[in-house]
A protein has these predicted regions:
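Short intrinsically disordered, low-complexity coil segments enriched in acidic
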Residues: 1-12, 16, 116, 120, ...
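Conserved P-loop NTPase-based nucleic-acid remodeling module centered on helicase motor cores
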Residues: 2-66
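Alpha-helix C-terminal capping segments
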Residues: 2-7, 42-45, 121, 125-129, ...
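Short, flexible active-site loop motifs that bind/organize anionic cofactors or intermediates
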Residues: 10, 22, 111, 174, ...
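Short coil/turn linker and secondary-structure boundary residues
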Residues: 15, 27, 33-36, 94-97, ...
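Conserved helicase motor core of SF1/SF2 NTP-dependent helicases
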Residues: 15, 143-205
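Phosphate/oxyanion-binding loops and surfaces in catalytic or ligand/nucleic-acid-binding neighborhoods
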Residues: 20, 27, 74-77, 190
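Accessory N-terminal region flanking or inserted into the helicase ATPase core
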Residues: 51-138, 147-152, 165, 175
């Protein structure tokens, strides 16, 4: 609005990765898992789920149910669910066998209902033939991307003329949601040019 631009017509690709996948896959809001769907799933499986939803801003998954949280975190980290559980079992208060059964039941529930979650969209995008090409690709807040998101970025990156990736590992705030800041830091080994800004224009001084 400040620059007199129309978001849909002038900036059709100015989106979060989840929004871009949603758009490219031709999804509708009616086909997406909602909080009430998770509650219905919980009632069906006999587990309490008071909160379960994806942020519309950054696509992070939030739930008061530890089983759902671990299932989604393993997916965005691109890890085998039970191996991820085994690496954290000393700090988790959930059962291994129940975790596996719930993960499988959640897949069946979504299939029966014809619903997807935002993590499904990223996985489906990776299977889809990439049609768009970009002269310039700009990825912001890269320190907060999960490995699944990085896989999506690399697919888009491969069809971009020039790519800029911006981030600050000191501001990584989504490790709890599966963000892989180490992947961001390791980019210095494969990019042509790295520029470090000595002045923060968000926090002057």
């Amino acid at each position: 609005e400040k620059f007199g631009l129309d978001k849909e017509n002038d900036l059709p690709f100015f989106r979060t990765l989840h929004s871009y996948a949603f758009n490219q896959l031709g999804m509708t809001k009616e086909k997406m898992m909602k909080s009430e769907d998770y509650k219905e799933f919980g009632q069906k499986c006999g587990i309490p789920i008071r909160t379960a939803n994806y942020s519309t801003e950054d696509g992070t998954f939030n739930s008061d149910n530890e089983y759902l949280t671990i299932i989604n975190t393993a997916r965005v980290k691109r890890l085998d669910l039970l191996e991820y559980y085994d690496s954290r079992k000393n700090i988790l208060d959930i059962e291994r066998s129940t975790l596996f059964l719930l993960a499988e039941e959640l897949k069946r529930f979504k299939k029966e209902k014809g619903l997807k979650d935002f993590t499904d969209l990223l996985e489906l995008f990776l299977e889809k033939e990439m049609l768009n090409k970009f002269e310039v690709l700009f990825i912001d807040e890269a320190q907060d991307l999960s490995l699944l998101q990085w896989d999506m970025v690399r697919k888009i990156w491969a069809r971009a003329g020039k790519t800029y990736i911006a981030g600050d590992d000191d501001q990584a705030i989504f490790k709890w949601a599966g963000a892989d800041v180490d992947h961001f830091i390791a980019l210095k080994e494969e990019v042509d040019d790295i520029q470090t800004l000595n002045q923060s224009y968000r926090i002057p001084g």
